[in-house]
Amino acid sequence: MANAAQKKLAAQNKHILTFMLAADLIVNVLFWILRFFVRSGLSKFSKFVYAFASISSGFLHYQLHRAAAPKYDARGSLLYVGQDLLQEGVTSYMVDYMYFSWILIFLAALTSVKVFAFYLLVPIFVVYKAAPLLKMLLQQLKNFKNQALNQPPQQQQQQQQQQHQQHATPSEPVLSKRQQKLRKKAAKYSRP
């Protein structure tokens, strides 16, 4: 079987997407049953927060389904495997957010809608994950600014000083063999 890995990934994605759909439906149905038949009703704010949680996790489920659902032709052969749902990165964060939303919806159904205050952890997590990227971006911008002002950063200055001390005697830069050949060839053909 030449496409065994693709078929395995397609089956895995289909299984995960089916689980996500079932979990989403079960959590939302349990919320409505527990909130309206066992506990008291909801205020407008509570309905708004529930709608936000439910719609955001549903939207992410829809996006993941579009990206990862395997597609088959009329004969049943695999056309498109889909994106791996177990990969790291944005896909992983989307799945984690869905699980986080389901847990909060379920806990809000069992206890109080004050559990939705834990949604404030999401921006904190985003800042935690984005801080190293932002720091790296600011460092690169600082390097670009220094290059534009012809003021190399301190590390580059130190490297230049070391190179200058090592190669203080030759007046011309040392060329590689390839560069020497190219210059010789250019000099040969540039003569009339």
UniProtKB/Swiss-Prot annotation:
The UniProt transmembrane annotation reads: 16-36, 102-122
Q: Which coarse location class applies to the principal site listed for this UniProt protein? A: endoplasmic reticulum
Question: Membrane topology for this entry?
Answer: Multi-pass membrane protein
Keyword annotations for this protein, in alphabetical order, are:
Endoplasmic reticulum, Meiosis, Membrane, Transmembrane, Transmembrane helix
The ranges of region (Disordered) come to: 149-192
Q: Which InterPro entries match?
A: SND2/TMEM208
Q: Quick check: keyword Ubl conjugation in the entry?
A: no
Q: Does the keyword Transmembrane apply?
A: yes
A Pfam family of the record is: TMEM208_SND2
| Basic residues: bias regions | 178-192
Entry GO CC: endoplasmic reticulum; endoplasmic reticulum membrane; intracellular membrane-bounded organelle; vacuole
- Stretches with biased composition (Low complexity): 151-167
- What GO terms describe the biological role, i.e. biological process, of this protein? meiotic cell cycle; protein insertion into ER membrane; protein targeting to ER; vacuolar protein processing
Cellular localization per UniProt: Endoplasmic reticulum membrane
Family label: Belongs to the TMEM208 family.
Q: What exactly does this protein do?
A: May function in a SRP (signal recognition particle) and GET (guided entry of tail-anchored proteins) independent pathway for targeting a broad range of substrate proteins to the endoplasmic reticulum. Has a role in meiosis.
- The molecule here is called SRP-independent targeting protein 2 homolog
